[in-house]
């Protein structure tokens, strides 16, 4: 394979991995530990 193809696949893989981790953190098990600043300031 060419170098440009490998770089493109690597960057795409990193982007997909980061997006998956962000979605897991936002909506998966760790989301229960996140604090809600709007709930803390119940005006």
Swiss-Prot record:
Disulfide bonds: none
The keyword Transmembrane helix is annotated on this UniProt entry: yes
Protein localization: Plastid, Chloroplast membrane; Plastid, Etioplast membrane
GO CC terms of this entry: chloroplast membrane; chloroplast thylakoid membrane; etioplast membrane
Primary location group: plastid
GO biological process, one term: photosynthesis
Keywords: Chloroplast, Membrane, Plastid, Transmembrane, Transmembrane helix
Organism domain of life: Eukaryota
Pfam family, one: PsbN
Topological relation to the membrane, as annotated: Single-pass membrane protein
Transmembrane segments: 5-27
PANTHER family referenced in this protein's UniProt entry, alphabetically: PROTEIN PSBN
Family stated for the protein in its record: Belongs to the PsbN family.
Role summary: May play a role in photosystem I and II biogenesis.
UniProt protein name: Protein PsbN
Gene of this entry: psbN
